[in-house]
Amino acid sequence: MNNPRGAFVQGAEAYGRFLEVFIDGHWWVVGDALENIGKTTKRLGANAYPHLYGGSSGLKGSSPKYSGYATPSKEVKSRFEK
């Protein structure tokens, strides 16, 4: 008999190894999910409220020179004016 330990001890060790892997795996998955949720929330917030995140425009790569409101290039006439 090479291993004098009983079945209960071996079962407890096996269960402990299983539980360790199970809990470690779940922490990994939950941690990744929370990280991705945080990044997505930040990105959506920056797109919706660019002034809160230090940007002047909601579109990435937009030039400060051309951002802002559009200006008409010709005279604007009302459709219902007589």
Swiss-Prot record:
Tell me the keywords, alphabetical order: Bacteriochlorophyll, Chlorophyll, Chlorosome, Chromophore, Electron transport, Magnesium, Metal-binding, Photosynthesis, Transport
Low complexity bias located where?
Answer: 59-69
Compartments, record wording: Chlorosome, Chlorosome envelope
- What Pfam families has UniProt attached to this entry? Bac_chlorC
**Residues at which a bacteriochlorophyll c binds:** H26
What GO annotations for molecular function exist for this entry? bacteriochlorophyll binding; metal ion binding
Q: Does the keyword Transferase apply?
A: no
User: Cellular component GO terms, alphabetically?
Assistant: chlorosome envelope
Q: Name one GO biological process term.
A: photosynthesis
- Ranges where the record places region Disordered: 55-82
What residue stretch is flagged as signal peptide? none
Q: What function is annotated for this protein?
A: Component of the photosynthetic apparatus. The light harvesting B740 complex binds bacteriochlorophyll c.
What family is it from? Belongs to the BChl C/E-binding protein family.
Q: What is this protein called?
A: Chlorosome protein E
Organism equals Chlorobaculum tepidum (strain ATCC 49652 / DSM 12025 / NBRC 103806 / TLS) (Chlorobium tepidum)
The lineage, from the top, is: Bacteria, Pseudomonadati, Chlorobiota, Chlorobiia, Chlorobiales
This protein's gene is called: csmE
